[in-house]
A protein has these predicted regions:
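Radical SAM enzyme core and accessory elements
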Residues: 2-11, 31-32, 46-164, 179-183, ...
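Conserved SAM/AdoMet-binding glycine-rich loop
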Residues: 6-14, 209, 236-240, 248, ...
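Glycine-rich beta-alpha loop elements in corrinoid/cobalamin-binding modules
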Residues: 13-16, 21-55, 76, 83-86, ...
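Flexible glycine/acidic-rich beta-alpha junction loops that bind and position SAM and/or redox cofactors
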Residues: 39-51, 246-255, 459-464, 493-501, ...
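N-terminal [4Fe-4S]-dependent radical SAM core
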Residues: 179-182, 296-346, 647-652, 662-668, ...
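Secondary-structure-rich domain cores
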Residues: 189-250, 254-261, 377-380, 384-387, ...
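Catalytic cores of alpha/beta
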Residues: 253, 437, 497-512
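Canonical Radical SAM [4Fe-4S] cluster-binding loop centered on the CxxxCxxC motif
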Residues: 339-377
Length: 730
């Protein structure tokens, strides 16, 4: 009898700063069934063992006998190995939030040995300034570790990487041959570290099942190595593999050799398949591959429904060393820094994407195509429980695109409960994000959003079926930025039929977005054709020709293709990267776009004030929509004092309002009759459980009291001040 029914494992390597959420979500669900589970982030455990005094000592011993000739950069690290060995424990401790006083030594350059990645002082001053001592030190320690990682990759193990391991072998490996051959090679130093940690976990937990969550191609090699180790040393333990990689890449699996490493492979959401596996009745297996008589069989009892989102329990991080994760800053990109620095509770607001129509996205797969939201109350309950369990108040909502109306309800629920949280998420830059909604999200704790601008061309946005326009994107990013929320834009180039002119015009749009402060962070991605996207399913609609080789029986997702109508985009990548790097620094806006490219490119056809014009033309339509509900969401109501004021010998009843806004106090005086109405109105609007009051209702009340023109009232300093400080129309 095993002490633990299931050991959930995230194999090396994923993020260093926070756990990948899959095992915590599965543990939360299995807990509701009374199934005893344990979990481990094997990647973090291996990193901590490797980047330690003993780990580096052994690593350099291995390097000494390696037949690889070292280049000058690696030779320098090897010669300075005592410096690295003596500093690594404190460097790691700094990234874990301990030893913070070391920041001064690190930034002065008197503590860490300097390797090839150490940046120019000018770049450091731009990225962190004079006030960002802790972040600057964090960046330098990250580069120090990356120098060591480069050494490991060049001398010890070519597959090593902080957030991926042998990623090339797993990325759309149509045939299993190369990966199979690599798995049969002698174990590397990193492999042996992984096996050592895995053995300790197994001896500690004594599980009956080991379930490997493989989110990315960079986790596949190590996952299969783990499976092999289990089968060779613990043959009674059954091994299952699932996660994002299997769900996207292995939907046509026919090569039985993979079952030399695992017993089962499951697809899509893991809750139901795992529950059915543990029940043991093969005829009730759900979305599960097995190997029977040397043949791959797919078992899927479609009569068994998936577990509803509300019944999946709360993600449970028990067993993961939350205080041991490393907050790193790899590159000076604001959103990437947010992604990798700090520990975030990861949570999903809704299963699938509420839009689900983008031509490049895997809309035919369950994780995108089946939309099932939680309620705001359910999400807030989950957040409160996670805060209690982890002690962390930061949340990353990992939805493909968070539904705006659900975000609105969640923000109201957070404010209603007076929760103190910080959160960020992915969005679509759609018209629902009014300035009022963005201010509400900011007040509830939102600090950043990322969204897909993709190809900044209205023709291509329409072809992609993005459901947004450049005008809309400009106005919505302005709303987020005006509310104090950082905006990161996902950018794409090389979409089918995209011309060189459109790529350059897209860059000009991006330049203007940065120039006008609408976007603070961005990243260019080269379009990749995937098998499960509308483009991959219907290539004839997008002027492309599929050129992939015959399927080899293992993985299929990224597809080779030829763009018949579009430009050759190989020449654009470096120029797009360089220009964006400068725009994020606030530099290079005056340079002609040609300066960023080595090859001749077309001149842009976008007018210089293209984006500014969109902002100038925007109307405050929210204030004209009488059906919008009014909320007054300041923590306290104003203090009101009534008195008589003498004016030209006459006594006039007056109301004085003292508002305690977040940025200071403001006083307003108005007629006593108006004051009584406004005092009552703000009281009603601040009651989140009270009767709905729309802007039309407010206007009707105003007119019924014979106060005059409501349109004129909405132009007064009092109304404008209220609108900027907590009176939202939603």
């Amino acid at each position: 009898m095993s002490d633990c029914a299931v050991l959930l494992i995230t194999p090396p390597f994923t993020q260093l700063n926070t756990p990948y959420p899959a095992t915590a979500c599965l543990k939360g669900y299995l807990d509701t069934l009374g199934i005893k589970t344990a979990q481990t982030d094997l990647g973090l455990e291996v990193i901590l063992r490797l980047f330690s005094e003993n780990g580096l000592l052994e690593m350099f011993r291995v390097a000494e006998i390696c037949p690889v000739s070292m280049n000058p950069e690696f030779r320098r690290i090897f010669v300075l190995r005592e410096e690295y060995i003596s500093t690594v424990d404190r460097a790691v401790a700094y990234l874990q939030g301990r030893e913070q006083t070391l920041a001064h030594l690190i930034c002065d350059g008197n503590f860490l040995p300097a390797g090839n990645r150490m940046p120019e002082e000018e770049d450091m001053e731009w990225a962190f300034g004079t006030m960002g001592l802790q972040d600057k030190a964090r960046h330098l320690v990250t580069l120090y570790l990356e120098d060591i990682a480069d050494f490991i990759t060049g001398v010890i193990d070519p597959h090593f990487g902080f957030s991926r391991y042998a990623e090339r072998l797993g990325r759309s490996a149509s045939s299993f041959d190369e990966l199979y051959a690599e798995l049969h090679k002698p174990s590397t130093y990193i492999d042996r570290l992984m096996f050592s940690v895995l053995q300790e976990k197994i001896e500690q937990c004594k599980p009956g099942w080991m379930m490997l969550s493989v989110p990315f191609p960079g986790n596949l090699y190590s996952a299969l190595h783990c499976g092999e180790f289990i089968k060779n040393n613990y043959p009674d333990i059954r091994v299952e593999m699932g996660g994002g990689f299997a769900s996207t890449e292995l939907r046509q699996l026919s090569d039985a050799r993979v079952f030399e490493y695992v017993d089962f492979i499951t697809l899509d959401d893991g809750e139901t398949p795992l529950r059915q596996l543990l029940a043991g009745d093969e005829k009730n297996y759900v979305r599960t591959y097995i190997c029977r008589n040397g043949k791959v069989c797919y078992l899927n009892n479609t009569e068994i429904p998936d577990v509803p989102m509300r019944d999946r329990g709360v993600p449970d991080y028990t067993g993961l060393p939350l205080d041991k994760y490393l907050s790193v800053i790899e590159i000076a990109n604001p959103m990437h820094a947010l992604w990798s620095n700090g520990r975030w509770n990861k949570l999903t607001l809704a299963h699938g994407c509420y839009w689900g129509k983008c031509a490049f996205c895997d809309g035919s797969l369950d994780y995108i195509g089946r939309y099932e939201p939680l309620t705001a109350v359910e999400i807030a309950d989950c957040m409160e429980e996670m805060i209690c369990r982890t002690g962390e108040r930061g949340f990353h909502f990992v939805d493909e695109a968070a539904p705006p109306m659900l975000l609105k309800e969640l923000a109201l629920e957070i404010l209603k409960r007076r929760m103190t949280v910080v959160w960020w998420t992915n969005v679509r830059f759609e018209k629902s994000y009014t300035l009022d909604l963005c201010r509400l999200l900011k007040q509830s704790g939102c600090i950043a959003v990322s969204g897909g601008l993709e190809v900044a061309s209205d023709r291509l946005l329409k072809l992609i079926n993005k459901g947004v326009s450049l005008e809309q994107v400009s106005q919505v990013t302005d709303h987020f930025t005006s509310a104090g929320i950082m905006v990161h834009a996902y950018l794409m180039y090389g979409f089918p039929s995209e011309t060189a002119q459109e790529t350059i015009d897209s860059l000009e749009v991006v330049r203007q977005l940065f120039l006008n402060g609408l976007v603070q962070s961005a990243f260019w991605h080269r379009f990749a054709l995937t098998a499960h996207s509308p483009v991959g399913c219907h290539p004839e609609k997008y002027t492309i020709r599929i050129t992939e080789k015959p399927f080899g029986g293992f993985a299929r997702n990224d597809i080779d293709f030829e763009d018949i109508a579009g430009a050759d985009h190989d020449i654009f990548g470096e120029g797009l990267r360089k220009s964006l790097y400068n725009y994020m620094r606030g530099a290079g806006f005056d340079l002609p776009l040609q300066k960023w490219f080595d090859e001749p490119v077309p001149k842009t056809l976008i007018p210089p004030a293209y984006i500014v014009r969109f902002l100038a033309e925007e109307q405050d339509n929210v204030q004209r929509d009488g059906h919008k509900r009014c909320y007054y969401l300041l923590p306290v109501l104003p203090e009101v004092r009534y008195f008589d004021r003498n004016k030209k010998g006459k006594s006039i009843p007056v109301a004085e309002f003292l508002f305690h806004f977040r940025d200071g106090d403001s006083r307003f005086q108005l007629k006593a009759g108006w004051g009584k109405w406004l005092e009552d109105l703000l009281s009603r609007l601040s009651d989140k459980n009270g009767k709905t009051v729309t802007l039309k209702d407010v206007e009707s009340e105003f007119k019924a009291c014979h106060f005059g023109s409501f349109d004129q009232f909405m132009t007064t300093p009092l109304w404008r001040s209220l609108r900027e400080n907590g009176l939202y129309l939603l």
